[in-house]
């Protein structure tokens, strides 16, 4: 089925027993892409390939946001936000989070959720206003790694967007919707 769009990206802080707290809506997303970290190894014997092992050990995640929100940076990257001032410190440690979004695949809404992600600092890209308006986006890059049980991503299909949204909210601990 053809994919048609992506929306409603959320995250929650990964806590004890692989549960999530402090869930938040990220921002409108222009892109939400995961590239699996794959490994393929071949074993040879008797002058031929006798076995192939394919493994996936997580994914590189790229989330393109249309909004630049200091509170989101503080939570995702471990920075300190006080009275509207975001302080970046070399000792800051980003927490592990779970993050997901909803896309339309054919006639079904598909919730995608990466279970354990560590985001890194986005590039600080700025440009001057020109003759025509251009919009700039922020791209957060992260690494999704497996939990102790080996799982690193889940997907679930729904008949409605609202059902998929309720599912993601439940995963990350969002009790009121934006």
Give each language-model segment a name.
Residues 1-2, 79, 89-106, 129-143, ...:
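Repeat-unit-sized solenoid/scaffold elements
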Residues 1-73, 118-134:
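Solvent-exposed edge beta-strands and adjacent loop segments
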Residues 8-11, 109-111, 143-149:
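Short secondary-structure transition/capping segments
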Residues 11-15, 82, 141, 172:
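Compositionally biased amphipathic helical and low-complexity segments enriched in hydrophobic
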Residues 15, 105, 147:
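Acidic surface patches and DE-rich sequence motifs
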Residues 21-26, 111-117, 154-158:
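Short amphipathic beta-strand/extended segments with alternating polar/hydrophobic composition
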Residues 56-114:
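Structured, beta-strand-rich domain cores
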Residues 117-178:
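Mixed-charge, glycine-accented linear interaction segment located at domain edges/termini
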């Amino acid at each position: 089925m053809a994919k048609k769009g992506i929306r409603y990206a959320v995250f929650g802080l990964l806590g004890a027993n692989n549960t999530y707290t402090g869930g938040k809506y990220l921002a409108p997303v222009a892109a939400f892409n995961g590239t699996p970290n794959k490994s393929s190894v071949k074993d040879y014997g008797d002058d031929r390939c006798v076995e192939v092992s394919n493994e996936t050990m997580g994914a590189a995640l790229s989330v393109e946001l249309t909004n630049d929100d200091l509170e989101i940076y503080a939570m995702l990257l471990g920075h300190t936000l006080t009275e509207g001032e975001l302080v970046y410190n070399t000792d800051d440690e980003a927490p592990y989070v779970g993050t997901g979004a909803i896309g339309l695949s054919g006639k079904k809404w598909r919730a995608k959720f990466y279970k354990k992600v560590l985001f890194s600092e986005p590039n600080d890209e700025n440009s001057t206003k020109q003759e025509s308006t251009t919009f700039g986006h922020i791209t957060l890059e992260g690494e999704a790694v497996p939990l102790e049980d080996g799982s690193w991503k889940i997907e679930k299909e729904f008949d409605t967007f609202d059902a998929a949204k309720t599912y993601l909210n439940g995963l990350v601990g969002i009790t009121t919707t934006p």
